[in-house]
Each structure stands twice: as C-alpha cells, then as structure tokens.
Amino acid sequence: GSSHFIYPEASIDIQRHLGSDIVMAFDECPPANVKESIVSKAVERTNKWTRICYDHLKKTGPIYSWSQTLFPIVQGGTFQNLRKQSAESLIQFSSCGMAIGGLAVGEDKSAMFDTIALMDEVLPKDQPRYLMGVGRPTDLVKAMRHGVDMFDCVLPTRNARNGQLFTSNGIINITNTEHKDSFDPLDENCNCYTCINYSRAY
C-alpha cells in the first residue's frame, strides 16, 4: 500500500462518492487515560474540522439522487467539562443526528457510562444518538437506557469469525469439542429464528 494524506474535505468527498446516507465529520479520537490538555486539543481540532466538513458538504451538493446528512462526532474523553463543551459546540452542525466518539478505547467502564449519561442530558432529544465502537450486548442495553439509538462495532463479526456466540448466559465458544454433537439450543432463553432452528452441533 501507499500513504495518503486525508484532510476533512477529502473525507467528505470520499463519503459523497460512496453515497453514504450519514456522512461522518472528521474527528480526532485520543487514546484513553491521556492528559486533559491533550484531549482539549483534540476537542478543538474536532470542532474546527467539523466546521470545515459542514461547509464543504453544503458547498458540494449530492452526487446521487438522495440527500446526505452530516453527523458531528462529540469528543472529550471522559472529561465531563470537555464532553459538554464539545457537544454544545457541535450541535449547530447537526440537523439529523450526532455521534458519541472516543469511548470504548480503554477507559474504565463506569467512566464510559458516566459520559454516556452526560450525553443523554446534553444532546438533542429529537435527533438520533450514535455511540461509536461499543458492541457488547450488555453495554448496548445499558447505553439504550441512556438514550442511545445507534451503534457500530467490530465485536459481533470478529467474535463470530472466531466461533463465539453471545447468549443470555454469556459467551459460548461454539468450536469447543463439547458442542460438536450437542443438539442443545444455542440459547435456551431465546426465541429468535436462529435459536429455535439451529442447535450447537456442527
């Protein structure tokens, strides 16, 4: 492969050509447990980039026959003051939804949910909230209780690829030999199509 410098306008152009219904603003996601000053600079940069993305999206117009909308991405780590500042600065660029970024990157789980609870208070109630990178079923349910509507995460496909199933009793490693000839349901507490029609046997 080769190196490419991607700047905010280029990010918007790429998403325009992909035909994304939801175009994500360019953002900086700092790692967990860094100094507040570093996270503060990431918030400033994200705010600046979001303005550029917003202006460029308005200026360019859709390529295809449908409209595309911009989701700003709130940053700020687990610093409540920076999260609030980021959200309040970015609301002006949102008409259809906002993303909560920079979580599930190694921070303490309780700090993550404190931040999600703050976002429930600060973000518009009449727009979808998209929590990026969170995928454990128990975390999804808890986040939904705090007003989150949308999620994305590599976890379901990555775990499935490695033979893991999420069940109401925890994770099952389906490739373990104990399941090879087992006609037990995948999850005895679930009535979904898969659990009713497929067993653990393979």
Where are these regions (language model features)?
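C-terminal extensions of enzymes
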Residues: 27-33, 187-202
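Residue-level detector of alpha-helix boundaries and kinks
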Residues: 31, 35-38, 75, 104, ...
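Short, flexible active-site loop motifs that bind/organize anionic cofactors or intermediates
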Residues: 1, 36, 102, 133, ...
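Non-catalytic, usually N-terminal nucleic-acid engagement modules in DNA/RNA processing proteins
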Residues: 1-65, 177-180
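Hydrophobic/aromatic-rich, well-ordered segments within soluble, folded domains that form packed cores
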Residues: 12, 68, 197-201
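Glycine-rich phosphate/ribose-binding loops and adjacent secondary-structure elements
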Residues: 47, 56, 60, 65-186
